[in-house]
Amino acid sequence: MGRAWNAFLLGFGALLLAAFCLAWAFVAVVLLAFTPAGTGRRIGRCAAMYAFRAWLGAMQTVGAFRLDLAALDELRGAGALVLAPNHPSLLDAVFIVSRLPEAVCVMKGSLLRNFLLSPAARLARYVPNDSLLRLISRAAPELALGGQLLLFPEGTRSVGTLGAFTEAVGAVSRRTGVPVQAIVIEDESRFLGKGWAFTRIPAFPLSYRVRLGRRFEPPSDVRAFTAELERYFARELAAGMGEVPAEGGVMAEPATRLRG
């Protein structure tokens, strides 16, 4: 595709997503004031799922994205989980939330105070990551209700290679007794990774594949678990599309290769 078309796709995607967020923010403000917490939680999470799904569908229709996210559907109805994906892009949470109605995002405190994102995030009862203790205290009741906590082990986006893991995933799993589900995101570009300028135009179409990895039981040793999880992701990402034998835990069936 030519540069002008790529620039159009970038602008189209950004404006459409901003329009979705702005429209829903106004609705969420009203719902926050007039709906009970449980009702608001369900509405907020379902709205996020369908809005992100609609946006991704539009981006596929115009030829900007090629996506294989079907593996995530296996997690519907799976009960409480700590979802632990690698984090190559700002789009990672969008991919996961678009398929899972019980996803509970862990967000920076500054984003939860953003006028565009705050109403929807508070309605869905998303969790701030200002401190580990606060994260655990806010995540525990959501997990007890069957939520699936989306928590990136790297803590921030990567810069093309896997970043160092924090102990947050293991700490939450240990304190709540909820298993950790590894999610592997394969990204053929570095679009919206750490250091990618929002005005930088990528070469569309962009291809993404999400597949399920091992499911880890709650650890007794958080530090050892974190090291094991980091090694696991390093092997999976190095293997690319290949399947790597599991070392204990549950390996999901591999997803199909990128379509289109």
Regions found by a protein language model. Give the residues of each.
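Catalytic core of membrane glycerolipid acyltransferases/transacylases, capturing the structured
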Residues: 30-50, 61-62, 77-131
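Membrane-anchoring hydrophobic helices of lipid-metabolizing enzymes
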Residues: 1-81
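Alpha-helical membrane-embedding segments
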Residues: 70-86, 116, 138-141, 179, ...
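Short, basic, glycine/proline-bearing loop/turn elements
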Residues: 56, 80, 122-125, 153-157
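Non-catalytic C-terminal accessory region of glycerolipid acyltransferases
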Residues: 4-7, 133-260
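Short glycine/serine/threonine/alanine-rich loop segments
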Residues: 65, 126, 178
